[in-house]
């Protein structure tokens, strides 16, 4: 029996404002925050009120459409100058998530040849809405392909939150859980809590429970033991950037899981849209890894848990080498084998369509 699965949208366009699901408040309260300026959009991304690579791209696109409505100029040259300034400004918010730059570049390109301000404003709004709609379709396709990798009753481990609230809908790594729910295929999620910001504990568990999908929360330290004792059948994660050879940047701790998957001989899948690929970089060594504030580690919900002055290393992401990845699940299919060749072939086909 098919089931319609609904989860609150992470980003909604209101015409003269953006409503974002404030993910820092989850799971205790479901609060929407209204953003009316480009500065508020930038801060919302930085503060992780909006997070997840596709959702960041979507809110950035809407942020640029919003800003363009407020430029105090009658000259298209000045309009373009202000717009490019705001594009560059938003790009400073989260350097690792390639979807951010993909969305910014797409918005910039959409009005490159436009000669009137009114037309530019209209096109920017339409392009942002198109980016959101396309992401929903892309995520559904990812879920359909991912579901072919699993069978009814499988236990699947994941980390962070690559779910519906990190995208337009469905998510990437969590998409097969939603598509499976709709099609009557039961998948049980094991969610790593994901220190230090607890995206797994706060967000993945919240949204899966909203959809009545089975989920079990574990500490990050428990992953190996869970694989060993809970009959984990596979691991699936999202991605913030995938380079030309398949090396993948994702939430810190992802590489740990890939190593465990290899040791225990279970599949390790990465689920991501083509917009997350950065084929201008050859290997993961070229990816800039964002380092976040030390208080994310030294404090938990505002309470100091480490001695003041303790040295902290707090990278937000790590790089999983391609040889640890069983397959990369995209909206166009599953990439396996020689990642450098297959990724190049896929993008060549895309360029010719």
Curated annotation (Swiss-Prot):
Pfam families in the cross-refs: IF-2B (PF01008)
Main EC class the enzyme belongs to: isomerase
Catalytic activity: 5-(methylsulfanyl)-alpha-D-ribose 1-phosphate = 5-(methylsulfanyl)-D-ribulose 1-phosphate
Keyword field: Amino-acid biosynthesis, Isomerase, Methionine biosynthesis
Binding residue positions for substrate: 51-53, 94, 199, 250-251
Known pathway: Amino-acid biosynthesis; L-methionine biosynthesis via salvage pathway; L-methionine from S-methyl-5-thio-alpha-D-ribose 1-phosphate: step 1/6
Gene3D superfamilies to which the protein is assigned, alphabetical: translation initiation factor eif-2b, domain 1 (1.20.120.420), Translation initiation factor eif-2b, domain 2 (3.40.50.10470)
Enzyme Commission number: 5.3.1.23
Residues carrying the site annotation Transition state stabilizer: 160
GO molecular function per UniProt: S-methyl-5-thioribose-1-phosphate isomerase activity
GO biological process: one example: L-methionine salvage from methylthioadenosine
Entry annotation: catalytic residues: 240
Protein function: Catalyzes the interconversion of methylthioribose-1-phosphate (MTR-1-P) into methylthioribulose-1-phosphate (MTRu-1-P).
Subunit text: Homodimer.
HAMAP family per record: Salvage_MtnA
Assigned protein family: Belongs to the EIF-2B alpha/beta/delta subunits family. MtnA subfamily.
Annotated NCBIfam families: eIF-2B_rel (TIGR00524), PRK05720.1 (NF004326), salvage_mtnA (TIGR00512)
Record-given protein name: Methylthioribose-1-phosphate isomerase
Organism: Bacillus cereus (strain ATCC 14579 / DSM 31 / CCUG 7414 / JCM 2152 / NBRC 15305 / NCIMB 9373 / NCTC 2599 / NRRL B-3711)
Species lineage: Bacteria, Bacillati, Bacillota, Bacilli, Bacillales
């Amino acid at each position: 029996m098919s089931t319609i699965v609904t989860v609150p949208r992470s980003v909604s366009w209101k015409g003269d404002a953006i409503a974002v699901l404030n993910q820092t408040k989850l799971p205790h309260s479901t609060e929407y925050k209204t953003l009316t300026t480009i500065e508020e959009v930038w801060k919302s991304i930085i503060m992780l009120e909006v997070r997840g690579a596709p959702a960041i791209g979507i809110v950035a696109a809407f942020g640029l459409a919003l800003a363009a409505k407020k430029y105090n100029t009658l000259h298209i040259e000045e309009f373009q100058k202000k717009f490019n300034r705001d594009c560059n400004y938003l790009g400073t918010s989260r350097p690792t998530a390639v979807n951010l730059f993909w969305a910014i570049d797409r918005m910039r390109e959409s009005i490159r040849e436009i000669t009137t301000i009114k037309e530019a404003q209209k096109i920017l709004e339409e392009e942002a809405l198109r980016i959101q709609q396309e992401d929903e379709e892309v995520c559904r396709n990812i879920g359909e392909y991912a579901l072919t990798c699993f069978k009814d009753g499988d236990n699947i481990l994941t980390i962070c939150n690559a779910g519906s609230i990190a995208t337009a809908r469905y998510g990437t790594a969590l998409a097969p859980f939603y598509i499976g729910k709709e099609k009557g295929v039961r998948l049980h999620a094991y969610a790593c809590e994901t220190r230090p910001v607890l995206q797994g504990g706060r967000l993945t568990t919240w949204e899966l429970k909203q959809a009545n999908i089975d989920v079990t929360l574990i500490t990050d330290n428990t992953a190996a033991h869970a694989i060993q004792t809970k009959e984990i059948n596979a691991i699936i994660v999202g991605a913030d950037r995938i380079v030309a050879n398949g090396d993948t940047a994702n939430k810190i701790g992802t590489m740990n899981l890939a190593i465990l998957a290899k040791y225990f001989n279970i599949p390790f899948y990465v689920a991501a849209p083509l917009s997350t690929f950065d084929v201008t970089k050859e290997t993961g060594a070229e990816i800039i890894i964002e380092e976040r504030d030390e208080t994310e580690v030294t404090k938990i919900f505002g309470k100091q848990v480490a001695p003041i002055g303790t040295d902290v290393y707090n990278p937000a992401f790590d790089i999983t080498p391609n040889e640890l990845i069983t397959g990369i699940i995209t909206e166009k299919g599953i990439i396996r084998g020689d990642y450098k060749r297959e990724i190049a072939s896929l993008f060549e086909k895309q360029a010719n369509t």
